[in-house]
Amino acid sequence: MAGLLSCIGITAQAQDTKVEEPKGKAILQVFTNLHTGFGADNDDRGFELDRSYLGYEHNFGKGLSVKGVVDIGKSSKVDDYHRIVYIKNAMVSWKKNKLTLNGGLISTTQFNFQEKFWGYRYIMKSFQDQYKFGSSADLGLSASYKFADWISADAIIVNGEGYKNIQVNDGFNYGLGVTLTPVKGFQIRLYGGLNEAAEDGKKNIVNMAAFMGYKTEKFTVGAEYNHMWNAS
């Protein structure tokens, strides 16, 4: 009996002192294609490297992690055949139960949900990214909270110029979002944002978005409505 109690005590002590092991992972995404024309456009062909993401993410344990990512891609500021490097993410994240906080050069929440739901960025960007409704990353803070399995909310405040132009003008970009999952596979995303005018005489830019989609292992379908006011 004494030996059995001793074993139980040692096991319990080992479980109490167990700590989460730090973990890290490399990030590598490459978007490329092979294209060719037909007929009169037959000379327009070849391989194209559209964009690459290189980075590293490290989890220190107890919900604390850091991530750094560089974006290598095209820019309207240089020749089409040249590539330019930007820092896309340099951020710290902390997760505690249902709360998540992010700070630094973070991923924005304006259309991040739609990108993940779509899942085929290598084929086509999401609508808001393609038509410049906002930036996919910016310098600032964000917070999200999962109230229940079917509802979560998030808030963000960033500079508003994106990760390629860090605080060129004054003003902030504020955003609020709600994600609903009424049944498995079916999700609804609502988002509203306000980007403060950086110059006197100009109006604030307002963004509204509504998305709903259904996803199974065999197919994905979705619909999205976006509206932007006072865009220059």
Give a label for each model feature.
Residues N169, T179-S232:
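Detector for outer-membrane/organellar transmembrane beta-barrel domains
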Residues D16-G37, D41-G160, D170-F172, T179-F186:
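Outer membrane beta-barrel
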Residues V78, F113-Q114, N165-I166, E199-G201, ...:
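A short, polar/proline- and glycine-enriched secondary-structure boundary/capping micro-motif
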Residues F60, E161, Y225, W229:
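Flexible, active-site-proximal loop/turn residues at the rims of small-molecule/cofactor binding pockets
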Residues I156-N165, N195:
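Active-site-proximal beta-alpha loop/turn segments in soluble metabolic enzymes
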Residues M1-V19:
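Cleavable N-terminal export/targeting peptides
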